[in-house]
Amino acid sequence: MNPIRKKRLYWILALLCGVSIAMALALSALQENINLFYTPSQIVAGEAPQGTRIRAGGMVENGSLMRTQDSLALRFSVTDGAHNITVRYQGILPDLFREGQGIVAMGKLDRNGSLIADEVLAKHDENYMPPEVIHALKQAGVLDNPKRVKQESTR
């Protein structure tokens, strides 16, 4: 084989190896960061995977918030109007967190169907609700006037 062709072949092979490694790393990073959204009805039906990080959203049930006296541990129920799930969280809740308001909690399901949350997100203002929560509440027939609720603008 001609030395120039051999050198060119080595460069092409090195380039292909580099691109392959970069693609593998990118796909691995994306796979770890995908958090699918599930409603309480989907979680109760068993559609959400256990042990995988998911997002669950709905309305915080009135009277369901229970705090422990000696730690930051708390639990509350989230509903979509049809079903509810228990969310357990250790930490400080967002300032806008209230019973009867929309939230999205991120975490993993335990064997009992409770969400062990490591992050809780509350709505932005008195009219904002995450788009996934609006869709879930519309399907459950709970949301009475969806036009008064602002959705996050997509930019």
Swiss-Prot record:
Periplasmic side: 30-155
Residues the entry annotates as binding heme: 124, 128
Keywords assigned by UniProt, alphabetized: Cell inner membrane, Cell membrane, Cytochrome c-type biogenesis, Heme, Iron, Membrane, Metal-binding, Signal-anchor, Transmembrane, Transmembrane helix
Superkingdom, taxonomy of origin: Bacteria
TM region positions: 9-29
BP term (GO), one: cytochrome complex assembly
Pfam families, per the entry: CcmE
The keyword RNA-binding belongs to this UniProt entry's keyword annotation: no
Protein topology in the membrane: Single-pass type II membrane protein
Keyword match Iron: yes
Locations listed in the record: Cell inner membrane
Cytoplasmic side: 1-8
InterPro entries documented for this protein: CcmE, CcmE-like_sf, NA-bd_OB-fold
One term of GO molecular function: heme binding
A GO cellular-component term linked to this record: plasma membrane
Family to which this protein belongs: Belongs to the CcmE/CycJ family.
Alphabetical list of NCBIfam families matching this protein: PRK13254.1-1, PRK13254.1-3, PRK13254.1-5
PANTHER family, A to Z: CYTOCHROME C-TYPE BIOGENESIS PROTEIN CCME HOMOLOG, MITOCHONDRIAL
Function field: Heme chaperone required for the biogenesis of c-type cytochromes. Transiently binds heme delivered by CcmC and transfers the heme to apo-cytochromes in a process facilitated by CcmF and CcmH.
The protein's name: Cytochrome c-type biogenesis protein CcmE
Organism: Janthinobacterium sp. (strain Marseille) (Minibacterium massiliensis)
